[in-house]
Amino acid sequence: FRYCDPIVGKDDLVIVISQSGETADTKAALEEAKARGARVLSIVNVVGSAIAKASDDVIYTWAGPEIAVATTKAYSTQLTVIYLIAAYMADKLGKISKEEYADFIKEIESLPDKVAEILKSKEDVQYLASKFYNCHSIFFIGRNLDYAVSLEGSLKLKEISYIHSEAYAAGELKHGTISLIEDGTLVVALATGKNLFDKTVSNVTYVTYSYSVAVIRLLCCIIKGLRH
């Protein structure tokens, strides 16, 4: 951010995100934005941290101490705050109706119950991990928001398991990425958006017939379950 001569000024808002509130690169970017006259809003977890103090405004995620290396708790709360900001802005600008805004907030409030439901699958996840823990490489694929989640999922897998992992946009799978997939490679396909579900399944089907048949079939069943 600092090295690309950012086009920001007094009419701009720069949002910086940091779990600890002490991240050196993020703090330097914050200082650069303020030097150019921009207003800075920080999203941090640690109260009274350097970034929080240096910002014009701050939203605390209140995730509590982050013990896990993968920082899943802090990441989830950061996303929640970003979604809430986006919804609030859309409402104030009249981009969504009051009913849509209310539905959005209702969905956010339902997240704890949905997380609890996912955690009920702990044994299934452990079973899958026991089958694939010795994979040489693991690839995550997804489209749009699923691609962003794939990037984060791949990062967390690397941090915790020390297994080589990369994430790719599902639509780009045939452009080079496919050359890295071989028998025994695990491909995790995310397909949570209804409008792009069939396209992602098409990617999965292509890899199924070409490479890791057993692995992809299993993941196909998971994806179909999500669809229904």
Predicted segments, located by residue:
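Active-site phosphate/pyrophosphate-binding segments
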Residues: 57-186
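In a subset of proteins, long, contiguous C-terminal domains/tails are tracked
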Residues: 161, 227-228
